[in-house]
């Protein structure tokens, strides 16, 4: 699977297809976002085979469509089935209860339950012929050692025979093992279990964790999937439409998008415990969401009423109470920036909202512990910090080139000053807020995928002269995007470019993620993601499978405290 070559050779070959990918990606996103949420997508239970791992009988529950998987009442019925099996058996290790993906939320996973005489911890190793081994330390409680062990094992290779070896270790270090065999179902989204891997010039180690691919459009069934460092798909979460945007963790819960209207919350065993529906409140989700300090979801949204009345899209933020499910709008950028809306009247022509009015196009939201939020506006190439989100929303600052806001009301007063001479971000995505204990109070970092794409359909007469060496949606050989990192100093009202890297060009979507000393970059329209070392040398690049393949984001999670200790 690995091929030694220079990574830029691949980049040159696939760069020419970016314009086609951009068009297909944007049009398919729009079509999918417009799908009727009530349309039933037929569900067929995939075949798993094993004498050691049981498949539940769902005939009395009625799982007939993927929508049924995200029905919390049906999920509760599944939990009752599992509880009945636990009560009916005597599962003292080495006797165990093993179920194939009982909650139907992770295609290749296995639910495992047993008890031990002594307090113990559990680790496991998964082996499959022709694939590297996968290891994990099971997380069944907050304690390191327990007598009751209930967890979801992930890391199985789809459609082939896997051997899982469970190792139970007591406090004295005594080990007992049990081996099971299991052939999981095939993936519902991809034909292949592997991604093509190309090693770069760096010999540095990759970070631990699983790459999580969001919004791969070249799939037979929409899903978010996990990829290990060797390019093996180790997990798959089927969804209804759109993409999952990101995984957000809170105690023993994980949140992810399942459609353009819904976010699901699952527990460590894979059970869907709640589904939050903004569609019933008159909104659609897009791009991103996060949690605030009270445990509420903050999500970027489109008002269905504003879209129907004014063709206006992607300029709202809603708060979702995770206890009650109540949806409340906390930001309307037309009300916040009326002078911009009077000026930026052009209609989208090439993106997923062609024919719509999209003067802000929010694509990232980050929550700051002081109660403020940082959002990214692609259309204005501006990063905005906003305060008083619960009351009267107010602007703290903008980060952009001053030319963006020159002559637009008094908004130029909010633009921070550049600390040195550099070109500001353009069409950015995946903006991330980072605190650092070595910095003074009022200082922090912001890093982003700087698309370097000059696209602003809402203001077709905009002067781009402040952005030399920038590119349009018409990708050509030699175009590039950037990873950009700023030091923001609110005390001085400045921002400074402290790190930058030229990366393969992507006019839209895309993500970056700092992981210790390493950097993960996903130029979405290129269909690749790459991990770099601290010197910005390529360690390894992964190519998504399929023709014209694109992705929305790729982040890497270690799943510690959720699946693993």
Q: Which functions belong to the PLM regions below?
A:
Residues 4-27:
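Sec-dependent N-terminal signal peptides of Gram-positive bacterial secreted proteins and lipoproteins
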